[in-house]
Amino acid sequence: MIRQATTPRAKLRFYNACRGKLCLGATMPLALELLGKSQPGRFFAGPTLALDIGGSTAWMAGHANPEELAGFLTFCGCSAVVLDEAEAAPPAGWTRARSHTIFGLTPGRQLPEPEADEALWASLTFDRDPPARPVAEALFPARPARRDDFYSELCTKRSRGRARVWALWQGKTLACTVGAYALANGQAYMACGETAEPLRGRGIGGRLIVRLANELSAEGFQPVFLCAPERVHFYTRLGFEKLGEYARYEAPAK
């Protein structure tokens, strides 16, 4: 039976299902810890299952009966789920849509700094602690609801030392940003690397990513992130290690 992760027993099941999972072992327990009271309808657990349903895509650690899982996700209004095929069968009747490659860096290892347009790099201002609002606006310019949720969660995580975001400014314009949005359980889950469109292809994003990953690694964290298929070559070129793969499954068309 899948239930809300609100009781001590359900929370323990949730944490146990996430334990040792790359990426999900940082993001999901941290989200439950910080947001479980304010968003109790977002987190669910089964005997060997953890689910984070913060939107139309569910994030899943562990495993459950495929028929029960399909029915539950449909009831919750989910159209997709990300899971580890090595341990979980997909929801019954759902279709595999794409892979998410897990990249990372062994704690203590340092990557060489990638090439970049040095004149452009020198003209930008590095910001170790940019305001959350312009970061949210740069990442989600056309999705106001997602932007507001992101802003709120980032502020909550930062206030507790559980997130680290860097940025480069070109005057008063945010030129590039990347962050570690879940510092938990020895992992640093990196995400939301974004460069302003006119400046893309000049190396500043890759350099900022590597610098942040190197700093986190030197502090003993394992930097990890999920990568879409079209970005695999980019992160491979930067020197990150491929550590595994998750799969995205989508519900049948109605």
Where on the chain are the PLM-derived regions?
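Conserved acetyl-CoA-binding loop of GNAT-fold acetyltransferases
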Residues: A92-A97, T236-Y246
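N-terminal charged segments
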Residues: M1-A88
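Conserved acetyl-CoA-binding loop-helix of GNAT-fold acetyltransferases
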Residues: N65-F72, A191, T195, G201-A218, ...
